[in-house]
Amino acid sequence: MLATPGALHHLLLLPPPPHTQLAFHHAVGGVPAALLPLPRPRRVAASASTSRRGGARRRAAGARVRASVGEEAPPVVTEEASTSGGPTKFSTKIPVGDRHILVETGHIGRQASASVMVTDGETIVYSSVCLADTPNDPSDFFPMSVHYQERLSAAGRTSGGFFKREGRAKDHEVLVCRLIDRPLRPTMPKGFYYETQILSWVFSYDGIHSPDSLAITAAGVAMALSEVPNKQTIAGVRVGMINDQFVVNPTTEQMDDSELDLVMAGTDSAILMIEGYCDFLTEEKLLQAVETGQGAIREICKAIDGLVQKCGKKKMFDAIDLPPPELYRHVEDISGDELVKALQIKEKILRRKALSALEEKVITILSEQGYVAKDESSGVSENLADVIEEEDEDEVIVDGEVDEGEVHIKPVSRKPPRQLFSEVDVKLVFKEVSSKFLRRRIVEGGKRSDGRSPCELRPINSQCGLLPRAHGSALFTRGETQALAVVTLGDYQMAQRIDNLVDTEESKSFYLQYTFPPSSVGEVGRIGAPNRREIGHGMLAERALEPILPPEEDFPYTIRVESTITESNGSSSMASVCGGCLALQDAGVPIKFPVAGIAMGLVLDTLEFGGDGKPLILSDITGAEDASGDMDFKVAGNENGISAFQMDIKVVGITLPIMEHALLQARDGRKHILNEMSKCSPPPAKVLSPYAPLIHVMKVKPNKVNLIIGSGGKTIKSIIEETGVDAIDTGDDGTVKITARDLSSLEKSKAIIANLTMVPKVGEIYRNCEIKTIAPYGAFVEIAPGREGLCHISELSSSWLAKAEDAFKVGDRIDVKLIEINDKGQLRLSSRALLPDANQESSSKQQAGGSTREKAPQKDNLVKMTTRRPRRKKQAEASTAENNATASPKDLASQGSEMGTE
């Protein structure tokens, strides 16, 4: 067998020849095809020769070459050597927006392949990259995992629950993991199968500078410094728009006033990922925001490249293991016309079965021809050069010349060997060839797999009110993608509570939960807690719908939307947006206007497939077009603006002109979808379901809230119990929310609360009031449900009374007048003031100087009161306490609902 110069120098531990370095340079520049002419190293499972730390593998000695960083000099990299013989720290300050971020490495996490600390203000994110010692089996998916965690200690907090240690990742942390993963994955070369793990922790958080965009940059720096042979450096920023001005990496306070929340990542020359939401910004404004962010990313990447040149590790380009070029030719020759016919099948399941059968046929034919063999121990391909006959063990190739030395590296065959391929290689190549054929069909023929043109959308139909007991429901179908959306309305108790670094009591009154069961694609799979994809798609749809919701003051409901994907063939998250919008209308939610979502695709290199070289944008992509294309760009909004967006790509970046073309084409698609949604049959009900709860909001004076709650919540519990409402929620600002299942109980509770919190005025007269309690010194009269006052015995009648019970009993009704409100808010009432002879009798008594008959009893009573004072004092205290706590409301008086609150 002929050993190539690059492979031979690798085995002899010599520097590779110049042309080998040139091939690596192109790979770094984003052209992995330049690696194809180089033979892949032989795979041997778990052997020392493939161990990264075993010493037998020699990495390429060529220096890492990156894209041009422009004319401006990058920020200075500072090297700080420890005076005590400790590790050397490298650091650089990078200008971002109106401030600098600090990147440090070399002094912490030294056993990782690379680790960095990135600081913005007092927010610090630590990221590390580690690789496995041996490669995984070949696959079409780069084995990379990302983990991000926000330590509560970063904000000086500890979990309030029983378990103090951080555990399962929160939804917000999962979303940040996806933000880190998605821009890094396109920069990884095909054929690199070493499992890679990125760990990121927030170690310090100042509540001002957000850690999520910082974590993207930290992971990008760590990856650039590590041995992973990524193609280009990436960085991430956040862009906000405040007062029509774009701000890079705005503070949390600035974001409160921002109309845009854009998180993006890219290289020094292209965009890799964008995600965010806005208040129906135009396409032009969004493009300006992306351009602003790209400028900041460019400067960060320049600085990172300078740091890599100073302290970066050599890249493992020699570990890239690609299928041999001959295999592509064999697969294309065998599949040929049958592959073209299979790709023309419109139905997804039938097409998948046809492609699977064709793949097996290709493997069978190659096996019969002697091209496919499987090593039983490792499942990797073997080369017949190891057992070639007529070999001369003394003859080897060194730098293209014969050397007859004693070093025996590889035998040289006098006959060209037949290459053996593994089944895994055949499957990988078949997938690539299928993708290539599909792209060629779209570019050359102008027709996609289902017969549509590039700008054409799939058929759309929708219907509402499928589920009679649900508060709102809709079924949205677009081609072979279908979403069943259900809306549930509730009170504050249904809100989604969030535990974050700063605010432990934050909650969401609107949230969308996305479910993607395996049955939606006709498969058998795992069922359980939502995975990262489901969390990410749900958040995207939630952000798309949130701007159209009415303010909480107008619609005080907690809204939960569930989107279950019943069929899937591309852009199921955008189907969730459309179905969710219809379900909201069906539930009677007064949305501002309808929204829709669409997924856009891309074939970037059309020249390769017979096109004119211009990028081809596809509207409403299917699953196959997503997998075979170069972009998945989801855009949601209405005819005039965008509410949410998310872009992932599979190539090393796209430019702003391509993005502009995609956004404008997406706007046309949204208009078409909204028009189709307006034809929904049956249409949305647009009224509250009879099964939805009723919520009424009242405003009372803040100092009256305690009257509603009562001692230990006694009063509010009694109102709920006796009126039958579901819940009563009070706020410190005087807001009272009543949730009930029927109007009758709602009106009862409204009347009770209105009377409890009313502000009585001296001189007001209350008619037909019930005596609730009789005491020796007077009677307690209920002037309104739950509000009582004391009518002293001297104010009960114009005649003298020895005991109140002599003339009145509990349950009697009298008219009273409010004559005094003391400092404690207690009411003093008088019935005598309303009697016709009250004023005349009082005047005659004053003129006579008082009668003897009245004085004697007063003296006798004084003695009696002296002997009974302790008992009467207790009674008075008990009555006062009862007055403060208010009586339990029972039957509502008609006057109760008429009394207003202030």
Curated annotation (Swiss-Prot):
It catalyses: RNA(n+1) + phosphate = RNA(n) + a ribonucleoside 5'-diphosphate. Residues 693-753 form the KH domain. Residues 80-91, 839-850 have a biased composition (Polar residues). Keywords: Chloroplast, Exonuclease, Hydrolase, mRNA processing, Nuclease, Nucleotidyltransferase, Plastid, RNA-binding, rRNA processing, Transferase, Transit peptide, tRNA processing. Belongs to the polyribonucleotide nucleotidyltransferase family. GO terms for biological process: mitochondrial mRNA catabolic process; mitochondrial RNA 3'-end processing; mRNA processing; rRNA processing; tRNA processing. It is found in: Plastid, Chloroplast. Residues 852-862 have a biased composition (Basic and acidic residues). GO terms for molecular function: 3'-5'-RNA exonuclease activity; polyribonucleotide nucleotidyltransferase activity; RNA binding. NCBIfam families: polynuc_phos, PRK11824.1. This is Probable polyribonucleotide nucleotidyltransferase 1, chloroplastic. Its EC number is 2.7.7.8. It comes from Oryza sativa subsp. japonica (Rice).
